Amino acid sequence: MTITQFKIQKLENFFGSLPKYATEHSAGMDLIAANKQPIIIKIGEIQLIPTGIAIALPDLFEAQIRPRSGLAVKHGITVANSPGTIDSDYRGEIKVILINLGKEDFIIEKGMRIAQMIISKYERILWKESNTLEETVRGSGGFGSTGV
């Protein structure tokens, strides 16, 4: 396994530990809430939660912010723009956009694990305009066309 090192900065409001993998084979690192006061996410409401960190990714890398399954299953708390994308040229604080799809208000306490961050490599492309596309078995079928 290759381990790559990227820079991370603890900001003034940082709390807890740096993002880390929970197990040897985890794809995502937990992000910790760094809010000064508890944040109440009312039913159906969206809140922006600070993490107290900023990162520097090299070109052709991104960070994806994804929900934690436990928060989603137990409380209906998920990442509103899932997956959120942190571009390689962004140097500000990473913040997580959470939405409450649950049945009761939910409180985000300082130090709570609120999301996962996945680091991914990607490719940049150029579009080649065409009047036709290659045929496939699926064709233009979508939105349940292959079965439910």
Curated annotation (Swiss-Prot):
Record-linked Pfam families = dUTPase
Name the Gene3D superfamilies for this protein. Answer: 2.70.40.10
User: Which EC numbers characterise this protein's activity in its record?
Assistant: 3.6.1.23
In which pathway is this protein known to take part? Pyrimidine metabolism; dUMP biosynthesis; dUMP from dCTP (dUTP route): step 2/2
Domain of life of the native organism? Bacteria
Q: Which reaction does it catalyse?
A: dUTP + H2O = dUMP + diphosphate + H(+)
What UniProt keywords are attached to this protein's entry? Hydrolase, Magnesium, Metal-binding, Nucleotide metabolism
For the ligand (substrate), the binding residues are 68-70, 81, 85-87, 95
Which cofactors does this gene product need? Mg(2+)
Query: What Gene Ontology terms describe what this protein does at the molecular function level?
Result: dUTP diphosphatase activity; magnesium ion binding
Q: Mind telling me which NCBIfam families this protein's record contains?
A: dut, PRK00601.1
Which PANTHER family does this entry report, sorted A to Z? Answer: DEOXYURIDINE 5'-TRIPHOSPHATE NUCLEOTIDOHYDROLASE (PTHR11241:SF0)
Q: What protein name applies here?
A: Deoxyuridine 5'-triphosphate nucleotidohydrolase
Per the UniProt record, the source organism is Rickettsia canadensis (strain McKiel)
